[in-house]
From Swiss-Prot:
InterPro entries: Defensin_beta-like. Has bactericidal activity. This is Beta-defensin 2. Keywords: Antibiotic, Antimicrobial, Defensin, Disulfide bond, Secreted, Signal. It comes from Mus musculus. GO terms for biological process: defense response to bacterium. Residues 1-20 form the signal peptide. The keyword Transferase does not apply. GO terms for cellular component: extracellular region. Disulfide bonds join 37-66, 44-59, 49-67.
Amino acid sequence: MRTLCSLLLICCLLFSYTTPAVGSLKSIGYEAELDHCHTNGGYCVRAICPPSARRPGSCFPEKNPCCKYMK
């Protein structure tokens, strides 16, 4: 019975340790959004876009605005 409980505990700990994997997927998605914003001539800001810029999208995961200067 003790072995079964120990095995169950180990399995629970292994399966609950998915947070770093989710965190790394988030950062991969963030890099992709950031690159997409920069490739289109934009930049990510923490606040709102200045009046001389428009907002073509957002930067993943924090939903920061992606601003691009109007021509």
